C-alpha cells in the first residue's frame, strides 16, 4: 500500500510539473516568448502569433533558428553569415543590420520588446525575455516519460511530446548543412517516442488511440516500419482486414524490399 501511494505521489508531482510547463497556452507576461520550430517557425507572445510566412524572409527564419540551436550566446555578423550563407559574404555587417531592422518591425506587431539585440559580443536573443521552445519542451516530456512510475502517466507524457512534433526542425531549411545534425536528432527521437507509445497503447488495448497516433506518425515519417507493424497489428486484432490490407500496400510503397519482408514475417503473413 505504501509503495502504491508513493508511486501515485511521484506521478502527481510529475503531472503538476507538466501542467506548469511554459507553452503558448499559458503565456501571461510580456516577457514570455514561445518559439515553435517543429515543421514551420512560429513565435508566440501574450499579444499574438507570428508565423514563418509573416516574417516574409527565409533569411530571418534561418537566423532565428540558428541563434536558438547554436548553443552559443552571441554571434558576430561574419560568423552568422559564414554558417548560413557561406556563398554570400559581401558586407555581412550591413546585411545583418538590415535583417535585424526588418525583424524588429515584424516582431513589433506582437511585442514591444526587441527579440534580437546587438551587443559587444555580437547578436543574441534579448536577455530580458523568457524564451522557451517546443524542442526544449519535447526534451522535458521525454525525460519525464522515462521516469514515469505508471504506464498511464508514461503514455500521457509521450502523447504530449509527440503532439508537439509537426515535422522536422524548420522544414523549409531541410537538408541545409548547419541544421542537418540538429534536425536529425529530433526526428530520430520522435520516431523512438512514437514506437514506444504505440507499444504501450497496444499493451493497454487502446486500439483507437493506437490507430490515430500510428496513422499521424506515418504521415510524418512514412518510412517507419514499426509504425506500420503496430497499425496493421491493431487493425487485424479488431477484425479490420481490409484496412490492414491497405496499410500493407502503403508499407510496400515506402519501405525497402527487405524491410517489407521483415514486416510481413513479424506479423505472421506471407505478403505474396
Task: Pin down the residues of each PLM region.
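Cytosolic linker/terminal segments flanking nucleotidyl-cyclase catalytic modules
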Residues: 1-34, 240-243, 248-272
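Intrinsically disordered, charged and Pro/Gly-enriched terminal/linker segments
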Residues: 69, 89-90, 124-272
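DNA-binding patch around the recognition helix
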Residues: 28-36, 98-129, 255-264
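Short boundary/linker motifs that mark transitions into or out of structured domains
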Residues: 2-61, 114-122
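Short amphipathic alpha-helical recognition elements used for nucleic-acid or partner binding
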Residues: 51-84, 103, 226
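DNA-recognition element of transcription regulators
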Residues: 37-40, 55-65, 89-110
Amino acid at each position: 500500500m505504501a509503495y502504491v501511494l508513493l508511486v501515485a505521489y511521484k506521478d502527481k508531482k510529475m503531472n503538476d510539473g507538466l501542467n506548469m510547463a511554459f507553452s503558448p497556452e499559458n503565456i501571461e507576461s510580456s516577457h514570455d516568448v514561445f518559439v515553435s520550430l517543429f515543421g514551420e517557425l512560429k513565435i508566440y507572445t501574450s499579444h499574438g502569433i507570428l508565423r514563418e510566412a509573416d516574417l516574409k524572409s527565409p533569411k530571418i527564419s534561418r537566423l532565428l533558428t540558428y541563434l536558438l540551436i547554436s548553443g552559443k550566446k552571441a554571434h558576430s555578423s561574419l560568423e552568422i553569415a559564414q554558417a548560413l550563407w557561406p556563398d554570400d559574404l559581401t558586407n555581412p555587417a550591413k546585411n545583418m543590420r538590415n535583417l535585424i531592422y526588418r525583424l524588429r518591425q515584424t516582431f513589433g506587431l506582437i511585442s514591444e520588446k526587441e527579440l534580437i539585440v546587438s551587443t559587444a559580443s555580437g547578436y543574441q536573443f534579448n536577455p530580458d525575455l523568457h524564451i522557451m521552445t517546443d524542442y526544449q519542451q519535447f526534451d522535458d516530456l521525454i525525460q519525464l516519460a522515462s521516469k514515469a512510475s505508471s504506464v498511464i502517466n508514461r503514455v500521457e507524457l509521450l502523447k504530449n511530446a509527440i503532439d508537439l512534433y509537426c515535422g522536422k526542425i524548420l522544414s523549409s531549411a531541410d537538408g541545409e548543412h548547419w541544421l542537418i545534425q540538429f534536425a536529425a536528432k529530433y526526428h530520430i527521437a520522435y520516431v523512438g517516442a512514437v514506437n514506444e507509445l504505440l507499444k504501450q497503447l497496444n499493451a493497454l488495448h487502446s486500439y483507437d488511440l493506437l490507430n490515430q497516433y500510428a496513422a499521424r506518425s506515418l504521415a510524418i515519417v512514412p518510412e517507419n516500419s514499426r509504425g506500420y507493424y503496430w497499425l496493421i497489428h491493431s487493425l487485424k486484432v479488431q477484425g479490420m482486414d481490409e484496412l490492414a490490407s491497405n496499410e500493407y500496400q502503403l508499407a510496400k510503397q515506402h519501405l525497402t524490399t527487405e524491410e517489407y519482408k521483415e514486416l510481413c514475417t513479424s506479423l505472421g503473413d506471407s505478403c505474396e
